[in-house]
């Protein structure tokens, strides 16, 4: 059965000498894999529409297993991402996180629109750290992870000074600090941002400027939480961390 849908290219894998298996995140069908025959050939009509991060319209032969991609039309190439090594690292992490954090053939139109908006924002030059933090926080619910960000996990208090307890799965207030000696100290702004990014509508994002200190706190909390609960080891995350270290070194050398 032929079916048409819009999708984002999350990943491609070479298959044989001339073919690719393309993993798409689609609005209508969720995450699906399709065979793109001949897509490795330079003059193939499927080569251009099987580029990473591309947003397009795809016509495919749908089967119970791996479908076959018949043709595609680019809607947005995300060229700005692919031409920038640093942005490619961020986008690759977003794509792999979505790929590994979702099940196949489970439609989630909200997730599709959110990831599309995330890639658009990266492509247009929005701070990639901010976009990545928001994606990481939004993906928690998709993976069935629900940190307590509205009140203290122990006494339910909504006022006071809050740190983050990875062990206890959320905010812990100053009255309960002794319950987790390994809690992560964070500033009030970081606590607000964790909550904001978890519930935030990305389409409303304006110009957000975060201090490096705030970014470091967000990164520490989110990375440790993922290590403890997600069960994911992503090669793209390691590469992204290496790229961020390189970026910081380049910044220090310039100064």
Curated annotation (Swiss-Prot):
Recruited to foci following DNA damage; probably interacts with RecF. Interacts with SSB (sbbA). Belongs to the RecO family. It comes from the Bacteria. It is found in: Cytoplasm, Nucleoid. InterPro entries: ARFGAP/RecO, DNA_rep/recomb_RecO_N, NA-bd_OB-fold, RecO, RecO_C. Plays a role in DNA double-stranded break repair. It seems to be involved in an RecBC-independent recombinational process of DNA repair. It may act with RecF and RecR. Is recruited to repair centers, foci that are the site of double-strand break(s) after RecN and before RecF; may actively recruit RecF. A positive modulator of RecA. One of its GO terms (biological process) is double-strand break repair. This is DNA repair protein RecO. One of its GO terms (cellular component) is bacterial nucleoid. It comes from Bacillus subtilis (strain 168). It holds the Pfam family RecO_N. The mutation previously known as recL16 is a mutation in this gene. The lineage of its organism: Bacteria, Bacillati, Bacillota, Bacilli, Bacillales. Disruption phenotype: A single recO deletion does not induce RecA expression after DNA damage. Cells are very sensitive to DNA damaging agent methyl methanesulfonate (MMS). A recO deletion suppresses the lethality of pcrA DNA helicase depletion and increases survival of the strain in the presence of H(2)O(2) but not MMS. The gene is recO. Its main location: cytoplasm. The keyword Nucleotide-binding does not apply. The keyword Iron does not apply.
């Amino acid at each position: 059965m032929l079916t048409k849908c819009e999708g984002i290219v999350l990943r491609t894998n070479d298959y044989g000498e001339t073919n690719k298996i393309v993993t798409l995140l689609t609005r209508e069908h969720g995450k699906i894999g399709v065979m793109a025959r001949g897509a490795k050939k330079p003059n193939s009509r499927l080569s251009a529409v099987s580029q990473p991060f591309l947003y397009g319209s795809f016509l495919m032969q749908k089967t119970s297993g791996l479908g076959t991609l018949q043709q595609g039309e680019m809607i947005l190439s995300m060229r700005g991402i692919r031409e920038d090594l640093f942005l490619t690292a961020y986008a690759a992490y977003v794509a792999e996180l979505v790929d590994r954090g979702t099940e196949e053939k489970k439609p989630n139109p909200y997730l599709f629109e959110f990831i599309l908006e995330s890639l658009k924002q990266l492509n247009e030059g929005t701070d990639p750290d901010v976009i990545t933090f928001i994606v990481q926080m939004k993906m928690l619910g998709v993976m069935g992870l629900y940190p307590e960000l509205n009140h203290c996990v122990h006494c339910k208090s909504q006022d006071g000074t809050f740190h983050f307890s990875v062990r206890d799965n959320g905010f812990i207030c100053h009255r309960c600090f002794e319950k987790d000696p390994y809690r992560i100290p964070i500033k009030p702004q970081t606590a607000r941002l964790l909550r904001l990014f978890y519930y935030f509508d990305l389409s409303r994002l304006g110009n957000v400027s975060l201090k490096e200190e705030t970014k470091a706190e967000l990164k520490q909390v989110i990375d440790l939480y993922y290590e403890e609960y997600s069960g994911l080891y992503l090669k793209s995350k390691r590469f992204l961390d290496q790229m961020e270290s390189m970026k910081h070194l380049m910044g220090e050398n310039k100064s």
